[in-house]
């Protein structure tokens, strides 16, 4: 499943770059030779991946900031919904820390960075309790993602960094896919508390 997600995101990256180039070329041609020369700055693997990291980063960070601090430890288990089985599921805070922790675990092999102090598992450091601390941890993890994306080239994307068993492109794209996966769970937690996710507010107004 993880490999399939990585392949899907990789194909999307390549298709997106090709579509972008076609659209830019067509638009520049309509504006004349000078505009065409200025507009044709081709995307790179690094720039396309960096854009996708920015996209998921905005969705996740905005969702995290939308949840009031007093609701950060909310879990669907506490709703006691008849017929449901939410026993032991992560709280909203741990969902956010899980995304950040996974970002570090997935992207640090690409950059060679050491893991932050206290990061031992997928639930993130136990000492991070407040909303501000958790969101800072989240933002820092995406900064590592941008750093990882900047290292990608056509020559190294199929190499395995360090002792990793995965290629650079698989790690880079899987980080994006994983974050989007858990963003979907964050959305459900927000809606269970009567909060419309920021990304959906324009659509609902």
Where are these regions (language model features)?
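Positively charged n-region of N-terminal signal peptides that target proteins for export
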Residues: 1-4
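Bacterial N-terminal signal peptides
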Residues: 8-17
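Signal peptide processing junction and immediate N-terminal pro/mature segment
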Residues: 19-34
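N-terminal pre-domain segments of enzymes
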Residues: 30-44
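Short, contiguous alpha-helical
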Residues: 50, 54, 58-61, 73-122, ...
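A generic structural signal for well-ordered alpha-helical segments enriched in polar/charged residues
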Residues: 58, 62, 66, 143-147, ...
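Short, flexible helix-adjacent loops and helix caps
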Residues: 68-72, 111, 150, 154-157
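Acidic/histidine-rich alpha-helical segments that form the ligand environment
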Residues: 125-160, 170-182
